[in-house]
């Protein structure tokens, strides 16, 4: 029991330190540092569709279904933005502002991001070890759906993810670059 508790504490400490390190790479005003423009999503990456992705691609990724969101709750100040994004794996679109009720880690990632590829297996482990106490939601940003599903499968991340091919969450979450990890309160 003590080993498991230490493992959980160790995993959460790594996530927290990663957040601090990543936050230090941006600018104070939330603008892009020189040379850090995010690529645009390919035309085939259309939210709400599986264009380019087969059922086999979705099943191979082994992502858990996206959380159910409440369409009727009002967004909260400094909360998740009021955006509805397509589920990357199986599930209905998710209204970010409507996902509440549990502590949550939100991880913004992309298949073209080298640090994301290194971080996602660890994020998946934290999720599997703490899923009873802590929800996790990935946001695949500025990416191709097929490439994102392939990376999800190759990193064994398993936590549910939504797709944001147009990078709409950048302003609402003050995302400077990827990976970005945020901790969200239940309320």
Predicted region positions:
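Thiol-based oxidoreductase modules, predominantly thioredoxin-like and allied folds used
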Residues: 132-147, 157-167
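Acidic helix N-cap motif at the loop->helix transition within catalytic regions
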Residues: 96, 146-149
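A short beta-strand-turn-helix
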Residues: 75-77, 83-104
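Conserved hydrophobic/aromatic "anchor" residues
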Residues: 83, 94, 108-109, 151, ...
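Thiol/disulfide oxidoreductase modules built on the thioredoxin-like
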Residues: 150-157, 163-187
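N-terminal targeting signals for export/organelle localization
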Residues: 1-86
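Short active-site neighborhood of thiol/selenol oxidoreductases, capturing the structured segment around
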Residues: 94-117, 123, 136
């Amino acid at each position: 029991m003590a080993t498991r508790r230490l493992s959980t504490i160790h995993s959460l400490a790594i996530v927290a330190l990663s957040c601090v390190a990543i936050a230090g790479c941006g600018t104070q005003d939330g603008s892009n540092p020189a040379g850090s423009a995010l690529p645009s999503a390919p035309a085939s990456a259309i939210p709400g569709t599986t264009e380019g992705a087969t059922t086999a691609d979705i099943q191979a990724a082994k992502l858990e279904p996206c959380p159910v969101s409440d369409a009727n709750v009002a967004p909260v100040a400094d909360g998740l933005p009021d955006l509805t994004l397509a589920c990357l794996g199986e599930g209905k679109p998710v209204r970010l502002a409507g996902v509440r009720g549990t502590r949550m880690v939100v991880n913004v990632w992309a298949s073209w991001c080298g640090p994301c590829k290194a971080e996602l297996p660890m994020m998946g482990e934290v999720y599997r070890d703490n899923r009873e106490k802590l929800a996790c939601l990935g946001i695949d940003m500025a990416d191709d759906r097929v490439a994102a599903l392939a990376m999800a499968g190759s990193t064994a991340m398993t936590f549910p993810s939504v797709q944001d091919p147009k990078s709409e969450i950048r302003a609402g979450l003050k995302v400077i670059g990827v990976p970005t990890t945020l901790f969200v309160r239940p309320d």
